[in-house]
Amino acid sequence: PIYDRMQEDLLNNQVKVIHSDETTLVVSRKDEENKDRKKSYVYVYTNSFYDKKRIRIYDFQESRSIDKTAKWLKNYQGVIVCDNYNGYNSLKKQNENIKLQKCWAHVRRKYTDIVKNLKPKEKNNSKAYKILQAIQQLFNLESSYKRKNLLADERVERRRNEVPSIKEKLEKLVFESNPIKGSALYTAIEYTKECWNDLFTFIDN
């Protein structure tokens, strides 16, 4: 009953943003013949930092299939913050009331992992570092909105004024790059391109 009530509260029309992510774990199970270790998943769903009542729901699943998630999100109207797992793209197709905001933390990590392995002399001129700096500008803006306790309408107004120039800079850095295929930068760039159409939903929300 508690789980069901939390789920109802999370899917309430007042909740406009749901963050979703999953992680793997290995579960030991004993069948009739022997012990078997199987990779399983734990999904976590939570609402926005700005909601008065925070809700976190953990959901164990034996596979990464998003079918179960799709069932209880079928009537949801709002934004889902997620990584680039294709299951979320399917959710968007199944429910026209769902918008996706691909997670900037996942994108940023791709470039952070590259930059931390560069020598000091290499860093400043590297494409990964320049992209990382631009991404960090987005995080800095959001942090400043939190510190100033801006209301939702104020945040949207600031984003519409301040984010487009950063978006333009990032678009040029990402789409005009020609990294070596198979390199870490190539992987990061391709991931960013795949997410691109759903990376700036937050501007208007």
Roles of regions detected by a PLM:
Residues 1-205:
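Catalytic center-proximal scaffold of phosphoryl-transfer enzymes
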